[in-house]
């Protein structure tokens, strides 16, 4: 009788390791599900592989893209967005995500002329671009539920003035914070860039630069 009791007790003492592995497995599965859920619905990290958004974003900058805002409100002019390639881009064999700045909202009329961008007849005050655009474009009217996007490095960006508009369903989220490199950590603010404002014409001089037809991938 005593021997049986001892053996049964020994078996009970051996069971916790099995429970430990089971709990560890549950924890890992839960963590993976949470990570996938956060990346799909809340936020994700992206890096910048090209110069098309300079000087705002530099090559190898690391950003957080939040995905909640556009579930609650419409995108706004001046916001930096990440989006999946449009049908026009897929037809040109682009399959990675792009990052650009929203310039034209649904219903806007946009044109680029003599180094300036005009939205609904008003010239944008763009203090964030690398150099004034050295091309002419438009006027075009942005269709419903679509957006016109341009790179801040206007003369070195493969954007809407080449391939058209971005449907809203292609938008993945809004770039709102840079977390690398450390000296440049901070929020990507766009309060001063959102609205088209009338300003005095300025004389821009900039040599034309061939566009860099490389998408902003992961």
From Swiss-Prot:
The keyword Cell membrane applies. GO terms for biological process: signal peptide processing. The chain crosses the membrane at residues 27-43. Pfam families: Peptidase_S26 (PF10502). This is Probable signal peptidase I-2. InterPro entries: LexA/Signal_pep-like_sf, Pept_S26A_signal_pept_1, Pept_S26A_signal_pept_1_CS, Pept_S26A_signal_pept_1_Lys-AS, Pept_S26A_signal_pept_1_Ser-AS, Peptidase_S26. It comes from Synechocystis sp. (strain ATCC 27184 / PCC 6803 / Kazusa). Residues 1-26 are cytoplasmic. The active site is at 52, 100. SUPFAM superfamilies: LexA/Signal peptidase. Residues 44-218 are periplasmic. It is a single-pass type II membrane protein. CDD domains: S26_SPase_I. Keywords: Cell membrane, Hydrolase, Membrane, Protease, Transmembrane, Transmembrane helix. Belongs to the peptidase S26 family. Its EC number is 3.4.21.89. One of its GO terms (cellular component) is plasma membrane. Coiled coil: none annotated. It catalyses: Cleavage of hydrophobic, N-terminal signal or leader sequences from secreted and periplasmic proteins. GO terms for molecular function: serine-type endopeptidase activity. It is found in: Cell membrane.
């Amino acid at each position: 009788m005593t021997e049986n009791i001892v053996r049964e007790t020994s078996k009970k003492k051996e069971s916790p390791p099995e429970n430990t592995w089971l709990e560890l497995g549950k924890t890992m599965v839960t963590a993976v599900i949470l990570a996938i859920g956060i990346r799909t619905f809340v936020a994700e990290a992206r890096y910048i592989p090209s110069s098309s958004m300079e000087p705002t974003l530099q090559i190898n900058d690391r950003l957080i893209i939040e995905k909640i805002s556009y579930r609650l409100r419409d995108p706004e002019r001046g916001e930096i967005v990440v989006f999946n390639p449009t049908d026009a881009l897929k037809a040109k064999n682009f399959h990675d995500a792009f990052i650009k700045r929203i310039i034209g909202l649904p219903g806007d009329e946009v044109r680029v002329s003599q180094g300036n961008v005009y939205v609904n007849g008003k010239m944008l005050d763009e203090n964030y671009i690398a150099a004034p655009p050295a091309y002419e474009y438009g006027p075009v009217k942005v269709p419903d539920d679509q957006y016109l996007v341009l790179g801040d490095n206007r003369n070195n960006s493969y954007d809407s003035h080449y391939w058209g508009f971005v449907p809203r369903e292609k938008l993945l989220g809004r770039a709102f914070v840079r977390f690398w490199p450390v000296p440049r950590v901070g929020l990507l603010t766009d309060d001063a860039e959102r609205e088209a404002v009338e300003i005095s014409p300025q004389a821009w001089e900039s040599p034309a630069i061939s566009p860099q037809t490389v998408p902003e991938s992961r």
